[in-house]
From Swiss-Prot:
<dbReference type="InterPro" id="IPR023333">
    <property type="entry name" value="Proteasome_suB-type"/>
</dbReference>
<dbReference type="Pfam" id="PF00227">
    <property type="entry name" value="Proteasome"/>
</dbReference>
<comment type="subunit">
    <text>The 20S proteasome core is composed of 14 alpha and 14 beta subunits that assemble into four stacked heptameric rings, resulting in a barrel-shaped structure. The two inner rings, each composed of seven catalytic beta subunits, are sandwiched by two outer rings, each composed of seven alpha subunits. The catalytic chamber with the active sites is on the inside of the barrel. Has a gated structure, the ends of the cylinder being occluded by the N-termini of the alpha-subunits. Is capped by the proteasome-associated ATPase, ARC.</text>
</comment>
<dbReference type="GO" id="GO:0005737">
    <property type="term" value="C:cytoplasm"/>
</dbReference>
<dbReference type="GO" id="GO:0010498">
    <property type="term" value="P:proteasomal protein catabolic process"/>
</dbReference>
<keyword id="KW-0963">Cytoplasm</keyword>
<dbReference type="GO" id="GO:0019941">
    <property type="term" value="P:modification-dependent protein catabolic process"/>
</dbReference>
<feature type="active site" description="Nucleophile">
    <location>
        <position position="56"/>
    </location>
</feature>
<keyword id="KW-0888">Threonine protease</keyword>
<comment type="similarity">
    <text>Belongs to the peptidase T1B family.</text>
</comment>
<dbReference type="InterPro" id="IPR029055">
    <property type="entry name" value="Ntn_hydrolases_N"/>
</dbReference>
<keyword id="KW-0647">Proteasome</keyword>
<keyword id="KW-0378">Hydrolase</keyword>
<protein>
    <recommendedName>
        <fullName>Proteasome subunit beta</fullName>
        <ecNumber>3.4.25.1</ecNumber>
    </recommendedName>
</protein>
<feature type="propeptide" description="Removed in mature form; by autocatalysis">
    <location>
        <begin position="1"/>
        <end position="55"/>
    </location>
</feature>
<keyword id="KW-0645">Protease</keyword>
<dbReference type="InterPro" id="IPR022483">
    <property type="entry name" value="PSB_actinobac"/>
</dbReference>
Length: 289
């Protein structure tokens, strides 16, 4: 395709005149086409967050040699279930994955834009961003959404990464949480959760985290945590055996980030539900037949 010469010249002059950081794709969009960024709205529009679908609970756990991040599949719109099979966890580069809770449309665009941001930097600079650089880039993106967040369009990411520059590969898993203003915190306890069911998920993980010894045990604890969150939080969806809908998860270790096969998640979900099922022990007969 041939671009008209005037358009090409105007774009080039705008870039040179504004000193855009070409290594940042998000900054380039902000200068050249801000309407393409998530939640490109202006102040004064009123709160509209409750009118849009919201994604809910994300959990992340470190295990020896890596980190796992998982999310439920439900989205809600007020008191209604808007979707049952929403994907909330995305691999964003070879050693990084993000899960985002909040306004669903913005959350998905955040994850996609962040993946492009990391790829764009690596293509221009010839090297991938360091772990610290990845955290800073995501913090800047979250901060850029602050105006929309104040109108109810909040999207909070949870970052899981494997630091290839860590001195000890067994403790190279990283979990970073963010607030709406772009502040971030590296979790030292080994686990974190965000979203409406996060308080229940974290309470569950706290009791089970001692059982985490590898990726598979971390996955089981994550499934249990999401099950517990769904038990108390209506906006979080637990494993749905009838529809065959299960949480999604990503593991990240020295070999890179990979999606956990749905077959394995379904197997663990059935085990968790089976282990928690019990005969009716209520009533005058105490459950005796």
């Amino acid at each position: 395709m041939t671009w008209p010469l005037p358009d090409r010249l105007s774009i080039n002059s705008a870039i040179s005149g504004s000193a855009v950081d070409l290594s940042s794709f998000a900054e380039f969009l902000r200068r050249q086409a801000p309407e393409l960024l998530p939640a490109s709205i202006k102040h004064g529009g009123g709160a509209v967050g409750d009118q849009l679908p919201h994604a809910t609970t994300i959990v992340a756990l470190k295990y020896p040699g890596g980190v796992l991040i998982a999310g439920d599949r439900r989205s809600t719109q007020g008191n209604m279930i808007a979707g049952r099979d929403v994907r909330k966890v995305y691999i964003t580069d070879d050693y990084t994955a993000t899960g985002i809770a909040g306004t669903a449309a913005i959350a998905v665009e955040f994850a996609r834009l962040y993946a492009v941001e990391l790829e764009h930097y690596e293509k221009l600079e010839g090297v991938p961003l360091t772990f610290a650089g990845k955290v800073n880039r995501l913090a800047i993106m979250v901060r850029g959404n602050l105006a929309a967040a104040m109108q109810g369009l909040v999207a909070l990411p949870l970052l899981a990464s494997y630091d290839i520059h860590a001195s000890d590969p067994r403790s190279a898993g990283r979990i970073v949480s963010f607030d709406a203003a772009g502040g971030w915190n590296i979790e030292e306890e080994g686990y974190q959760a965000v979203g409406s069911g996060s308080i229940f998920a974290k309470s569950s993980i706290k009791k089970l985290y001692a059982q985490v010894t590898d990726a598979d045990s971390a996955l089981r604890v994550a499934v249990e945590a999401l099950y517990d969150a769904a038990d108390d939080d209506s906006a979080t969806g637990g494993p749905d055996l009838v529809r065959g809908i299960y949480p999604t998860a990503v593991t990240i270790n020295a070999d890179g980030a990979v999606d956990v096969p749905e077959v394995r998640i379904a197997e663990l979900a059935r085990e968790v539900i089976g282990s928690r099922s019990r005969a009716d022990t209520f009533g005058p007969d105490g459950g005796e037949k």
